[in-house]
């Protein structure tokens, strides 16, 4: 894989219903630009990966463990390994950046989705 790429050239993969990601995998971590449809839900789940994230556009109600908060552009999260979490997306949808360590190898073979990136918008 090339060291330098444009996000529009990264394949979009289905992660959940209404949730798709463009992921770049390194040796030790995964960076994902995640597109969440309006009013979609990421059901409660947990994984071995530590996860950090940032809202780029839109709004979410995010629950990590026992903490719930409404987040909009600029909001961040930190999810330790194996902590249950879930997301409810606002009516305008959302774009977020997620970082996972170790790599999300389970995301490498997800079903492909054919559509143009929602972010960044063409100039």
List PLM regions with ranges.
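A short, N-terminal "cap"/entry segment at the start of jelly-roll beta-barrel domains
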Residues: 1-28, 32-33, 109-123
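Short acidic-glycine-tyrosine-enriched beta hairpin
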Residues: 67-81
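Conserved GNAT-family N-acetyltransferase fold
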Residues: 34, 53, 77
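Ligand-binding loop in jelly-roll beta-barrel domains
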Residues: 81-106
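Glycine- and acidic-residue-biased ligand/ion/polar-headgroup-sensing regions
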Residues: 49-60, 65
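Conserved short histidine dyad/triad with adjacent acidic residue
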Residues: 32-46
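Structural motif
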Residues: 30, 59-61, 68, 84, ...
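Short, small/polar residue-rich loop motifs at catalytic or cofactor-binding pockets
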Residues: 28, 47-48
